[in-house]
Amino acid sequence: MKIMRKNHPLLKIINHSFIDLPTPSNISSWWNFGSLLGACLIIQILTGLFLAMHYTSDTTTAFSSVAHICRDVNYGWLIRYLHANGASMFFICLSIHAGRGIYYGSYVLSETWNIGIILFLTTMATAFVGYVLPWGQMSFWGATVITNLLSAIPYIGSTLFEWIWGGFSVDKATLTRFFAFHFILPFIITAFVLVHLLFLHETGSNNPSGLNSNSDKIPFHPYYTIKDLLGVFLLLLALMILALFFPDVLGDPDNFTPANPLNTPAHIKPEWYFLFAYAILRSIPNKLGGVLALILSILILAAFPLLNVSKQHGLIFRPITQTIYWIFIANLLVLTWIGGQPVXYPFTMIGQIASITYFAIILILMPISNTIENNIIKL
């Protein structure tokens, strides 16, 4: 078997990626979230596949087909809630994974980092079209409001959003194509994940110290396979607690009402993991400006490798940038909170301050603190 896994064309790839892979001996639990994201993706694809067997993408039957899944299909309620809450777990792991990348300077591996940003955007698109499928009030109005933002694009905007809608309003054609997108995108994500791993294994993984670890590496199996399995079991435990005890805690009560184009909810908002970007969008009074800020709030992650002027790798020995990093995380949490609040004073003002702070930290404060720390080292 040993010879086979090293010589067989297919097993050789698996062996070099998950068994004999030389891995830094000091990587902490923060490095577990990559494998947890893989576990989340598998859970989402499997539960989604079973849901797709019973779901109908028609405006007249979509809402009742979801109710049918929960009431009449064997363990349909469990599959549905695992899928819905699995998306939340996915974004929690994704946020921590990206946060760890920023903290420990993993963005210097620019190909891996940029594929990660593409993965983040694709996952957001998948989650958005998936949120529309139950065809509840918030699904319908969320789809209407967010897709309407495309009309802000000069010249082609109105044509573009009518083309995406498949008509002059969000209707049957929109739901059908959103279901098609939601079905195909996870497989595109899987392909990008393989490219992400390919680039990662070209350079090797980063480590907490930020130093070169070539002199001290251990095989991935059994050390990190056991460590990752523990993480997966804890993830499953958290997901099962969420799905079995608090299944609707992260959902919106408006989505228990079938979609009604004649009745607008008091406060239209997306899922909780989009609220930070939604707050940035709302903080700019101009429609086109808001859309650009929304897109830049994600694409600005690509600026990290370009703005990095530090002579040290990661933030572990850099107290000034460390402080700014944790202010950045706190600011993100404030934006998430503001995104869920109604558009009224003082929430709009807090949102505008937090949005300016978000961009200022990345574009101004972090490069300045890097330069200050470089000068301190010279002293």
Swiss-Prot record:
Pfam families, per database record: Cytochrom_B_C, Cytochrome_B
TM spans (from-to): 33-53, 77-98, 113-133, 178-198, 226-246, 288-308, 320-340, 347-367
UniProt remark on cofactor binding: Binds 2 heme b groups non-covalently.
GO cellular component: mitochondrial inner membrane; respiratory chain complex III
Residues bound to a ubiquinone: H201
InterPro entries for the chain: Cyt_b/b6_C (IPR005798), Cyt_b/b6_C_sf (IPR036150), Cyt_b/b6_N (IPR005797), Cytb/b6-like_sf (IPR027387), Cytochrome_b (IPR030689), Cytochrome_b_C_euk/bac (IPR048260), Cytochrome_b_N_euk/bac (IPR048259), Di-haem_cyt_TM (IPR016174)
Compartments reported by the entry: Mitochondrion inner membrane
Keywords: Electron transport, Heme, Iron, Membrane, Metal-binding, Mitochondrion, Mitochondrion inner membrane, Respiratory chain, Transmembrane, Transmembrane helix, Transport, Ubiquinone
A single GO BP: mitochondrial electron transport, ubiquinol to cytochrome c
Organism: Thaptomys nigrita (Blackish grass mouse)
Assembly information from the UniProt record: The cytochrome bc1 complex contains 11 subunits: 3 respiratory subunits (MT-CYB, CYC1 and UQCRFS1), 2 core proteins (UQCRC1 and UQCRC2) and 6 low-molecular weight proteins (UQCRH/QCR6, UQCRB/QCR7, UQCRQ/QCR8, UQCR10/QCR9, UQCR11/QCR10 and a cleavage product of UQCRFS1). This cytochrome bc1 complex then forms a dimer.
Binding site for heme b b562: H83, H182
Domain of life from the UniProt record: Eukaryota
Main location group: mitochondrion
Family statement: Belongs to the cytochrome b family.
The protein's required cofactors: heme b
Membrane topology, from the record: Multi-pass membrane protein
Function: Component of the ubiquinol-cytochrome c reductase complex (complex III or cytochrome b-c1 complex) that is part of the mitochondrial respiratory chain. The b-c1 complex mediates electron transfer from ubiquinol to cytochrome c. Contributes to the generation of a proton gradient across the mitochondrial membrane that is then used for ATP synthesis.
Miscellaneous information on this protein: Heme 1 (or BL or b562) is low-potential and absorbs at about 562 nm, and heme 2 (or BH or b566) is high-potential and absorbs at about 566 nm.
Name the record gives this protein: Cytochrome b
Organism placement in taxonomy: Eukaryota, Metazoa, Chordata, Craniata, Vertebrata
GO molecular function: metal ion binding; ubiquinol-cytochrome-c reductase activity
